Amino acid sequence: MQIFGVDIGGSGIKGAPVDLDRGDLAQERHKVLTPHPATPDGVADGVADVVKHFDWSGTVGITFPGVVTDGTVRTAANVDKSWIDVDAATLIGGRLGLPVTVLNDADAAGIAEMTFGAGRDRKGTVILLTFGTGIGSAVFRNGRLVPNTELGHLELHGHDAETRASTKAKEDEDLSWHHWAHRVQKYLEHVEMLFSPELFIIGGGVSRKADKFLPLIEGVRAEIVPAELENNAGIVGAAMAASSR
């Protein structure tokens, strides 16, 4: 069975048909740049471009970088603020003329990792953290998702954690892997103090370079592993969410 998945990010919108039996992309993903400003109409156009690239005519699952409840956006940290209180499912579904499901981006990635990736068969508290333009989070307790946790906005040294420890912060400040890993470690210690997880899964594009920074992180009790689906987890999870609606 195939469902189309789209992952809306702060820098890019990417998608592909997903093979739900294997938990993998059925075709090579297509990506367009996220418009700036990332307004609802502009982003909806970008999603439409990705879906039309595959001439897709079925159900579509879509991730969004913010809190989403019943298809409506509640926060918009890394896209235009005009998204707040927009019914994204109705807007994008109307643009595509297709049934859509919209959910938080990190929640989608977590759903995929818990089923097909690093969290498979893991009990207790598992937290997936996606590092990119911001920091997304997905918290699971015995396999059940606690949605819309947005732990990237925890305060760390007087600032949103994602302004110090995201991949964007590393790039903007030209931080070495060692310096950035120290910031990530402080962030993980803070999250661990609050939730005492058994496992941290590190996702986002930087998960492909886990060997450059994970060995530098010390003092965290929980096991820390890279996401197995890497940066495709959001696409896969979006398709999974759409298939269950």
Regions from the PLM with identified roles:
Residues 73-85:
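A charged helix-plus-loop insertion that forms the helical arch/lid used to bind
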Residues 1-59, 68-72, 90-100, 112-128, ...:
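ATP-binding/phosphotransfer module of carbohydrate and carboxylate kinases, centering on a glycine-rich
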Residues 78-80, 104, 231:
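Asparagine-centered polar/low-complexity signal
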